[in-house]
Amino acid sequence: MEDVPEEEFPTPSASPSSIRGVPSTRKAASIRTLGRSSADGSSSASRRTLSTSSPALPGTPKEGGKSPRVAGTLQRVRSSPRLPHDTEVEAAPSTMLYWSKAPVFGVIPMRTMRAHTVTLVDTTAWLFGGCDDKECSRDIFCFDTETMQWSRPETMGDLPPPSRAHTATLVDRKIVIYGGGQGSTYYDSVYVLDTITRRWTRPNVTGSKPPPRRAHTGVLYHGKIYMFGGGNGMTALNDVWTLDVSNMSKLRWDELQTIGRKPSHRGYHTANLIGNIMIVVGGSDGKDCFNDIWCLNLDTLRWTKLIVDAPHRRLSHTSTQVGSYLFIVGGHDGTRYRHDLLLFNLVSLAFEPRSTLGKAPSARGYHVTLLADSRLFLFGGFNGSTPFDEVHILDLAAAAYLPQVTHFDIQLPE
């Protein structure tokens, strides 16, 4: 089977809450607690925007002095807030979700934010890889979610090859890259970036390794990264593997034998870790675009399909946990790219309509979203012809979502 056109995947975000699968009805049980949720590469892939009013970039020597960069950290630049301004957009009420375009500056990634990964470490988002319409990148960029500044840190060591549709999983302060590919090449390699030392390593991994793949997903649970699905260039996959990262000097692969009916072979899906449950939304096998939602209990390894009213077909979308909701943004529905926001309630196990104000991002897929300081950041994407290099922000409106349900039980159907 050939992969779906634009064979890149967004990387899911995982933000654990407490969910336990209990065979019963499809409605949820008790809500117990309310509270606040808690490389080196070509320089052609970036551009530098400078102005006399912008602060110096991290690592740029001060005039007559040494570099302000502190070893092992990203130097934060103090600057006045840079606020978006658009006379055509009305101010949003405090209880509404509000889209705006981030006023970014610095060394900006150009045309490669498509099938890339973005991993949040403290307040810094680390971007790796991605592609334009010609080639893939192996560059690293950093985005400060407080100052909106892009920078390009120097990295060293055993650099990974240019890649798209890989996974990037945060383990302590290290980013573990697995799989991906470029052109007709699919990878089965593991690389680790230490965000403190900025050194890449390619560790030895014991055990039988999974087949090369891209467009898969990975979530971290109890010291293991659970990989699901993807494609190998000939067929879509529905296998589950674990990469044991509990000891970073002794990584190990294992294939899992799951229980019950499995999801069909797929890629372009998303996977979120909610407590001990991995929730898989949508995806494609190269022919069909799926609208189903599956749950894998990572303690019992049992698959369960959720019965959802008015499901939505999606591939190359993103899914981010915000309290007791999954925020599903964009993607492709099998016919066209979408720009809408879907909210899936993890308590009622149902989609809820929700409107937004401001200027929403245009229709796209293969973007990345992540949650930082009660804001949902959207990075890049692709609409079938144009890769985007912009950053959008969805303000989640504290009055509407905080405090919110952060500890809850889910009752899965048998």
Question: Where do the protein language model's features map onto the residues?
Answer:
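Kelch-like beta-propeller repeat domains
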Residues: M1-E414
